[in-house]
Amino acid sequence: SKVLVNWGGQGTYFHPQFCVNGKDTVIEKKRHSTKVIEDECISWLSSRDTSKPFMLMYQFKAPHRDWRPDSIYHDVFADFDFPEPETFNDNYFGRLAASENMMEIENHLNRRAMKLIAPSGLSRRDSMRWLAYGDKGQFWSPNDTLNGEALKKWKYQKYIKDYLATVRSVDDNI
């Protein structure tokens, strides 16, 4: 068995690390995790003992935050704007569990989730803080002209395109 181990046990999208057979052996692959997992599955299927029954179970990091599609999918939805769903302005009233989750487009998408690049000259620690800003309702905008509803719509488009491109890479690798 191989299990993603880095990034809080969820694995990373690029250069994932795997724990092998429950031991401390860690291997790192230098590609997108979705493609790595597909290749590992195909390799295992090709080399298994065909005279014996088998079960192959595999799972992907995708589509967990921060939704990083493989490079071939970066612009797959570039020329398309997705309509906002009916629940776009939902306030989760009367649904306590939903209201306590950090899943609001307006209030819970930080700079990292939006794939922004930290300003040059920051220390690694300050760069990580800069990228994390935007959680818990902290206000930020990628430029001086985006705010209010326009900013919320921009965040939604960025999020939904990254999310669906990430899911597309899973679909194509199953």
Residue ranges and their predicted role:
Residues 1-4:
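Short, well-ordered beta-strand core segments
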Residues 6-28, 47-51, 59-173:
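Active-site-proximal cap/lid insertion segments
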Residues 28-34:
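Outer-membrane beta-barrel proteins
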